[in-house]
Regions:
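Active-site-proximal alpha-helix that buttresses catalytic centers in soluble enzyme cores
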Residues: 9-307
Length: 307
């Protein structure tokens, strides 16, 4: 099929293509927490105690007064849209408005016949990117004239590694008393698939770029039920302290932005473990809308469109 170049991207003739950025979503006000958690739990309404616990966590990280935390997806969309130099860029959340249903309805109304989707999570897992994939397939049954592709992972791009290399190097990771702990979101052991191997491959590559001879891999933010991939970040921190570390540097490279699983699980829970042991806690900055980091996503999109 003949192809034509448009704004740095390539699309097939007679096909209008939209890019759909997919993200988890985050509550913007306390009243969002009930529908948000209910959606995460697939329609199961949380108990009053569960809501109280979650509210306390968001209160602790200053969620309700931090505009950037509330609009992170929009900021990432702006950066990605600028890098790709296109107008047909949409954003949808898995658990908050603007929902995936709303976004696809808007895309269809605008006349697009093809959608290329990318999830903010860099690694593919069945419960992560797979959840978006399954929901897309369900929604698109009502749109038989729209074709859809999803980029399942995009971590294996040089910009991804360069971002984390530069941030880790700035933390002086080679000091003798320092333990570097790489972490990604845990998943149920029954759904691991290739996720663990890909995450481990990435952490090994970052460590090699920095010159680390010894580091730790941990898994964090697991649900409080069922069997999840380990070791947990809490247990790894405790082991690093036993091994003699006086300074802990956390690298949550499986995540892309500041949110409750970083600002609470890492910066409050993990910090408390470290500081209660008399050691120093540090965490490298998250990418958020960093241009270098977002270029890894843009590169994956260009590659898919031009294949």
């Amino acid at each position: 099929m003949k192809r034509a170049v448009n704004c740095g991207l390539v699309k097939a003739d007679n096909m209008k293509q939209a890019i759909l950025l997919l993200s988890f979503g985050t509550p913007r006000q306390p009243s969002d927490l009930l529908p948000y958690l209910t959606s995460i739990r697939r329609g199961k309404i949380p108990t009053e105690r569960e809501l109280k616990v979650l509210t306390a966590r968001y209160d602790a990280i200053g969620q309700w007064d931090n505009k950037l935390l509330q609009t992170m997806g929009e900021e990432q969309k702006k950066t990605l849209k600028s890098l790709l130099a296109i107008d047909a860029m949409y954003l949808a959340y898995l658990h908050m408005p603007n929902s995936m249903e709303q976004a696809i309805e808007s895309i269809a109304t605008a006349g697009y016949t093809s959608i290329l989707c990318i999830v903010t999570s860099p690694f593919y897992s069945m419960i992560g990117t797979g959840a978006y994939e399954r929901k897309l397939h369900s929604i698109l049954r009502a749109y038989p004239d729209i074709s859809c592709e999803i980029i399942k992972s995009w971590w294996n791009r040089p910009q991804f590694f360069e971002y984390w290399r530069s941030q880790l190097m700035a933390a002086n990771p080679l000091q003798a008393d320092t333990a570097c702990i790489f972490s990604a979101h845990s998943v149920p052991t029954s759904t691991v698939g290739s996720y663990e191997d890909e995450v481990m491959s990435a952490s090994n590559q970052i460590a090699k770029m920095v010159g680390l001879n010894h580091w730790y891999q941990a898994w964090q933010s697991a649900a409080p039920y069922g069997e999840w991939l380990g070791p947990t970040i809490e247990s790894v921190i405790e082991q690093a302290l036993i091994d003699g570390a006086k300074r802990i540097v956390c690298i949550p490279f499986g995540f892309v932005s500041d949110h409750v699983e970083i600002l609470y699980d890492n910066d409050i829970i993990c910090r408390n473990i470290v500081e209660n042991a008399g050691a120093t806690y540090e965490r490298v900055p998250m990418p958020n809308g960093n241009t270098l980091f977002m270029e890894a996503m843009a590169k994956a999109i260009r590659e898919r469109i031009n294949k």
